[in-house]
Amino acid sequence: MSDSVILRSVKKFGEENHAFESDGSHNNDKKSRLQDKMKEGDIRVGFFELFRFSSSKDIWLMLMGGVCALLHGMAQPGILIIFGIMTDIFIKYDIERQELEIPGKACVNNTIVWINSSFHQNMTNGTVCGLVDIESEMIKFSGIYAGVGMTVLILGYFQIRLWVITGARQIRRMRKIYFRRIMRMEIGWFDCTSVGELNSRFADDIEKINDAIADQLAHFLQRMSTAMCGLLLGFYRGWKLTLVILAVSPLIGIGAAVIGLSIAKFTELELKAYAKAGSIADEVLSSIRTVAAFGGENKEVERYEKNLVFAQRWGIWKGMVMGFFTGYMWCLIFFCYALAFWYGSTLVLDEEEYTPGTLVQIFLCVILAAMNIGHASSCLEIFSTGCSAATNIFQTIDRQPVIDCMSGDGYKLDRIKGEIEFHNVTFHYPSRPDVKILDNLSMVIKPGETTALVGSSGAGKSTALQLIQRFYDPCEGMVTLDGHDIRSLNIRWLRDQIGIVEQEPVLFSTTIAENIRFGREDATMEDIVQAAKDANAYNFIMALPQQFDTLVGEGGGQMSGGQKQRVAIARALIRNPKILLLDMATSALDNESEARVQEALNKIQHGHTIISVAHRLSTVRAADVIIGFEHGVAVERGTHEELLERKGVYFMLVTLQSQGDNAHKETSIMGKDATEGGTLERTFSRGSYRDSLRASIRQRSKSQLSLLTHDPPLAVADHKSSYKDSKDNDVLVEEVEPAPVRRILKYNIPEWHYILVGSLSAAINGAVTPIYSLLFSQLLGTFSLLDKEQQRSEIHSMCLFFVILGCVSIFTQFLQGYTFAKSGELLTKRLRKFGFKAMLGQDIGWFDDLRNNPGVLTTRLATDASQVQGATGSQVGMMVNSFTNIIAALLIAFFFSWKLSLIITIFFPFLALSGAVQTKMLTGFASQDKQALEKAGQITSEALSNIRTVAGIGVEGRFIKAFEVELQTSYKTAVRKANIYGLCFAFSQGIAFLANSAAYRYGGYLIAYEGLGFSHVFRVVSSVALSATAVGRTFSYTPSYAKAKISAARFFQLLDRKPPINVYSEAGEKWDNFQGKIDFIDCKFTYPSRPDIQVLNGLSVSVNPGQTLAFVGSSGCGKSTSIQLLERFYDPDQGTVMIDGHDSKKVNIQFLRSNIGIVSQEPVLFDCSIMDNIKYGDNTKEISVERAIAAAKQAQLHDFVMSLPEKYETNVGIQGSQLSRGEKQRIAIARAIVRDPKILLLDEATSALDTESEKTVQTALDKAREGRTCIVIAHRLSTIQNSDIIAVVSQGVVIEKGTHEKLMAQKGAYYKLVITGAPIS
């Protein structure tokens, strides 16, 4: 067979298809398009763009809700007309009363006259009297107030209900579209986008958009309606005074504009900082076992806190700016008061253009307008925050994916042979444009043949497979299928023709049957059973208690590596693909499993094009064609024998792997003894239900989720059993009681001086309003004075007091804004930090709980800490403000008329009842809403963390359906909330009018029969009315308050939990001369999440200092569990693990783990530089660069790193995604070496490496093992045969132990294990 690479001609569907142009212009255009899209744009979302997802029904709901809000807003200006008329009547009545109290005056013929004066004098100076029946007038006005109150009740209910419902509908649609758009994105986009950041956007940012388009907008419309009607009425009743009052309005407008722009900018910066912190939290929680193994808890808390400090800084600036401009606007409003009364009194007293009632009408209308503009400005912060939050969301939604995996475009071939050809393909990853992966690659893969791709790590083998799946498009050249450029083919159809089995299989948290059905949605149960049989998975599945309905756990964490791999193969086989891609498909398997899986793969070779990437040459040897890769180029092609004769790349790899052994002899041994493997199914296939959670130490590099989290199955499929199981598991969602506020505030104690100053400032601000009502009623009373000079003098005094109030307000409002922003942001940072630290301090068994998977925990960190501010921070200031307002107002009211005050305060319990009901109901709704969104967050986390698998098997649509089901639950909760919230809000608004109605009715009686002054009636009514408004305003905080108590309860539940294995504890034994002697004594163990499955059943084995102990046995026998017990991820249920004669349960955990290093098969790297990842090996002290480089050299890593453009500062990407497996492994080994441990744990440390890398890494490991106690888990004999002790484990018990020679001589289980399955070199 020729070893040259042939470039065949290409069939074109049409000349207009630019995909076939050879100059690469199309590719360059795509590349530039991608780069343009990936750039962080300066696009800002306009407010009205937030409603882009509204339907016609939503528009009608918003229109009706808007009309209700506008009509509601007109109620207050409308009632001021009545108030003005009432004021004139009161003043006339009071003047008449004062005149009649003068000795010598009497009312004659409705005129007050001097009894002894002449008729002419009396006609000139007489005052009309006896025409005002004050009580009957008050009855009439009382009826009008009551009517307006009932109208407000109705309008307020529909105003809130309609806006909350339409907001929920639009947010539901936005979440759907956002998730759908993300699921359409090409893989290159995910390389440049943090999954943790996306989860934060789902959890936090969309919630901020909801705040901007729901009930807050209703409040804004209501307030603006009040403001506009007030202004119009003011101009109608007296344009001169209105213009004077409005003279300062441009300054108010400027203030509002500055607030909006500043808040938007600070919010954007704050959100970016929180998103970065969220990304770190997601990465760390997903890699919790690596963090625990290397003692990185405190280091990760510090890394997380650094980003919180940035967010805190911007939050404080936001509070300062808000406080200053709020004070600035209140100052202008009080200056307006002074100016209005000074000039208005001139128009009343000197020019007599206005009556006092008209003056009051104009003044109150314009001031009411100004105040409502001020209140509406607080909504601007929410709107600005919503727009800032929407920027990233909408950029993603509007971005057109370069490769749209759900597009209907492209051709579908009627028949497919399966011939694949690479034509001069050059490629680099979008996230690393400076590193060329494929360099002018050309090769042909013939239909129906098995083609093996071999080469060193980083040569481009796996990249070639990703191009075939069209995860990426070539930068230059093209890939063709049966002569057609794959870019011209429908991408969904293309991926349906391809089956993929990877080294690190991703299973989804549902049943085994549903995981296999992911391969083909319309598969019947018979198809699933057959696929399982073909993958040699049927027997182990049927041995499980629930068989095909067994839940696999998060990421397949409930299963061993071999079991997961066989389920993944079944999933690929059920598709009956024309092309099968095997990317290290059997490297993670033990010998027995590999043999069975290889047998399954051999069954389906006929009629399929198979492309295999493998490092075990025993797997490669049987291929029809082998293509050797080197530096992104296919350098040789041929059969096993042809390439050996050529003595090129392949020959070198074979030579390295065989280590001088005769490959043909190895094959004959396998053929001779393979028949003996039949007995091993019974001996080794049982044991633990999973391979002692192999994933506990080695994480999937592609997954952000912890493999040990056992979640209920997500409803990602239509299959009834899966969905039912999901529902049944809902009962496991833990309810929490709302946290007491005093405990929340206890966490703010370090900021007590800020809270004290802020509370004093808030108290002063709260007292300002009652003082204003006192001054206002006093000013009204001056108009009934008989002496005009006295009137002027008192009015000028009142105006001076208003100026003083304005000056005080600007100072105290700034202090309130700054101090509570400071205390609130520090609390948020503290809670996030404490929460994150508490999470990292939990025992590993806690993470096994379905309620604590990384997606849920990250969501809680993102939302709960910020929501706690609903009961602290600026909310405390608002509450103190309202409380002081109420107390001061009641004191003033009871001082001037206790009888009238009592009548009005009768209405207070109704307000309190309304608020209590609202708080109670909304607390429940907040909890339900959070549960629904956490389940939705779990779905998004699983889908996005495993996006390559999701895209490869084409199940985006199923995740989208599951996500939308959870959104529907959240929507139903919102609808129920709308009704309760609307009723409570309406009641709190309408009750004030009803209270006024009763007050004026009884006030009229007190004036008529008990001689109460009308100014006292105004004083009492306005004071209590304002305090009632404060009560209503307090209850408007109840939604935030309800959320805050639930969120705080979750935090306290976490902080209060005492983990059985406490990593932060200083207790426990430590000793200087740590030797590394290990004894497992009769250890029995079951995982907390699976108490019915016995994993270890009396394991006993010892290893002396400096010796190497190798654990061998079939998948699932409990090998890796022993490592976890040694690391104290868990403690044995019975028995003891002894370290140097000390019971591990009594040893200090940090001390124990600091003396243990681990290298696992699937190493977890962090999203930072290579240097930082190496230094992570020892977090107890600062590692020098020289020491890290020395470790890299020992791990055979240094030369590779120095070839990179940024060398040791090269970022490895999320979970090391920018590196090949071999490169990641060598970094992990360097990390372990730099730790200099006394005990070294090697869990399949070289199985993921290519032959060349394995040789160098094994040399490094052999050197690292010197002088250390070492425990090795491996499937390759070459790795373990030189061990001092080899322990054969079956069903959680050591059944044989000894040296290699001793065990082979016994011809027992070890002997059978060696000769069964894939050849062991």
From Swiss-Prot:
Which residues participate in ATP 2 binding?
Answer: G1113, S1114, S1115, G1116, C1117, G1118, K1119, S1120
Spell out the protein name for this chain.
Bile salt export pump
A single cellular component GO annotation: Golgi membrane
| Gene Ontology molecular function: any one | canalicular bile acid transmembrane transporter activity
Keyword Electron transport part of the UniProt annotation:
no
The record's annotation in CDD domains points to: ABC_6TM_Pgp_ABCB1_D1_like, ABC_6TM_Pgp_ABCB1_D2_like, ABC_MTABC3_MDL1_MDL2
What Pfam families would the database entry show? ABC_membrane (PF00664), ABC_tran (PF00005)
Q: Which residues bind ATP 1?
A: G455, S456, S457, G458, A459, G460, K461, S462
Origin species: Rattus norvegicus (Rat)
